Amino acid sequence: RGIDAILGGHTHDGVPAPTIVANGGGRTLVTNAGSNGKFLAVLDLDVKGGKVADFRYKLLPIFSDLLPADPAMGALIEKARAPYKARLEEKLAVTEGLLYRRGNFNGTFDQLLLDGLMAEKNAEIAFSPGFRWGTSLLPGEAITYEHLMDQTAVTYPWVTVNELTGEMIKTILEDVADNLFNPDPYYQQGGDMVRVGGLQYVCDPLAKMGGRISGM
């Protein structure tokens, strides 16, 4: 109530049109311009009589390679990277296919990490956090150490090996799914479905808690 617009910038997806939320004081426009500087959101408000009568909204895509870098900021970044430059640019492999991390349930970069965890830890199943950030790589592009850090630096320093029953795995999947798909937004905790390697399952987002996961 009393808020005309909320400009969001932390969703991983650019939302092309505002969500209009009706409330006791009128309506509130909620926008999201994605993350990592992908878009610049432009919101024009037509104000009449002290109230918003109309609005125009658009997302302007940012092509960073076409924009000249700010000299001072560029120098600051290069100075900070200098001690680690050789290590960050080390080439680890070349990808044969598109590596991305954009799906709500999985992505090819997720699968690469899961395969690596299972191989390194000799595990039948692997779990990985449900993130959707990180750099996408085109087929034939080198995977550098920086790309690896880009994908894993937040939580992967801690990797554990545990024995889990099928019932425990289903409980984990149901709990994460409820954080995402609970019809009450106050119980939704954001993020995405935990990534799973070595196990296939079926998820019904519209089912109730305890009944979303099947076909394991």
Regions found by a protein language model. Name each.
Residues 8-15, 95-97, 128-132, 168-172:
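A generic short-segment signal for beta-strand/edge and adjacent turn/coil regions
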Residues 33, 102, 106, 161:
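Glycine- and other small-residue-rich loops at beta-strand/loop junctions that grip anionic moieties
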Residues 46-143, 152, 201-209:
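A short C-terminal boundary segment appended to hydrolase-like catalytic domains
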Residues 1-87, 180-188, 192:
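Active-site-adjacent helix-turn-beta-strand microarchitecture at beta-sheet edges
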Residues 21-22, 27-28, 39, 111-216:
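Feature captures C-terminal
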